[in-house]
Each structure stands twice: as C-alpha cells, then as structure tokens.
Amino acid sequence: MEMMQRVYLSGPMSGIEELNYPAFNAAARDLRARGVHVENPAENSPPPCGTWQGWMRLALLQLARCDAIYMLPGWEKSRGATVEHGLAV
C-alpha cells in the first residue's frame, strides 16, 4: 500500500491581510483534493507564548514530518518562509 505524501505549506504571513490565510487554505484545499496530506500552518492554534519564534517552532516541527514543501507566491520576501525553504531543500 502506497503511503500518502505529506506536504508542508510555506509562504508569507506577517504583514499580509488576514495573515495570508486565504491563500494557505486555498492551496491546502487544492492539494487535499489530489490526495495529498497537507500540513497547513494557517490551521495551527497559537503557541502559548504568542511570539513569532513560538509560531516558527510549531512550523518547523511540522516541516520536519513532511516529505515535501509547497511554496506560496511571495515566499522569497518572508523571513519565516525563507528559513523553512532553506531547511527543506
């Protein structure tokens, strides 16, 4: 039996309207429709500390469990997304 591929979504959030959640959720919906298991950081509960570093700790734990990363447009200008990309490739 073939295992479902697990993909982490990465892209800009900080400074973008609604934290760019609509773009994250649309990409997650499209990938899930193709049978991909998606790790979508836009679906995470806030970390207890509420800091950027806390959010990144959650994100990097998710990324470590994934087989691939899917980069949303504008990721190159995002500090967090460039960290995630650097770790994934």
Give the positions of each predicted feature.
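Conserved catalytic or regulatory cores that recognize and/or transform ribose-phosphate-containing ligands
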Residues: M1-V89
